[in-house]
Design a protein with these regions (language model features):
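Surface-facing alpha-helical segments and adjacent helix-coil boundary elements at the starts of domains
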Residues: 1-253
């Protein structure tokens, strides 16, 4: 699967990406960029290696000042959208990794960047370090994003703080104590987007692996509030149900 995905970074991608870079960066040299990307090692690189390499090469052609980097990335996304590139585009996830690379010391600019970029390509992996370095600020922002009109931003409010996000950096503080997450999730317990509800359920399932009592208490509080809420709770308790947790089984009959 990873082998197939890495091949997404082929001629069609580079034509599309270089067109956007040419539009946004007046000094962009396509030949030099092509040589920087397609090193002797490129063909042997796996998916994650190619993405990391694209992050590094792209970063080198962006402005030095962090706020200017962010503005340029957002303009690049705009240029890609003008070509018809749709949102939640996996192959451009490498752009998100530039933000924590330079933005951990400028949390407000980074928060603004996350909100603007996460609709185009998910920030769930690149955003993890911000929870390590700025946990309180990020969790306060998650409460704001949980009420956002954009479902992609609302989803990030849940997905971004999952304690055990697969393939992502584990947020150990939330593995130890998930209570800061609960008020965020409760704001989305009746969300009208299935995309958001799935993320809330997955977050609860993460929590249940270390703190089943937290999820059980939430089920007792929210069960039968609505059909959507019941789906979130049952899907969020799936590991408990599969393992035969007595109280989870009794709650869902």
């Amino acid at each position: 699967m990873a082998d197939l995905l890495k091949n997404l970074y082929g001629d069609t991608f580079f034509k599309q990406y270089c067109t956007a870079l040419t539009t946004v960066i007046p000094s962009f040299d396509e030949d030099a960029f092509d040589k920087a990307v397609h090193t002797d090692e490129w063909e042997a690189m796996e998916l994650k290696q190619r993405m990391k390499h694209l992050t590094q090469v792209t970063d080198q052609i962006l402005p030095i000042k962090y706020t200017d980097k962010v503005a340029t990335i957002i303009d690049i996304i705009g240029a890609l959208r003008s070509q018809g590139v749709g949102d939640q585009n996996f192959i451009y996830t490498f752009l998100t990794d530039i933000i924590p690379l330079h933005g951990l010391q400028d949390i407000e600019t980074s928060i603004s960047a996350i909100e603007k970029i996460t609709s185009f390509t998910s920030f769930e992996f690149a955003g993890r370090l911000f929870f390590v370095h700025h946990p309180d600020r990020m969790m306060n922002q998650m409460k704001i994003w949980a009420r956002n009109t954009n479902p992609h931003v609302r989803r990030y409010a849940s997905e971004g703080c999952r304690p055990r996000l697969p393939w992502g950096l584990q947020l150990k503080q939330f593995v130890l104590d998930p209570n800061p997450i609960i008020p965020v999730l409760e704001l989305m317990m009746e969300d009208d987007s299935e995309y958001v509800r799935k993320s809330v359920a997955n977050n609860l399932n993460d929590i249940s692996k270390d703190h089943p009592e937290v999820v059980i208490n939430l089920i007792k509080k929210w069960k039968d509030v609505s059909k959507n809420t019941n789906w979130i709770l049952k899907h969020g308790a799936r590991t408990l149900l599969k393992s035969g947790h007595p109280e989870a089984l009794s709650l869902f009959g």
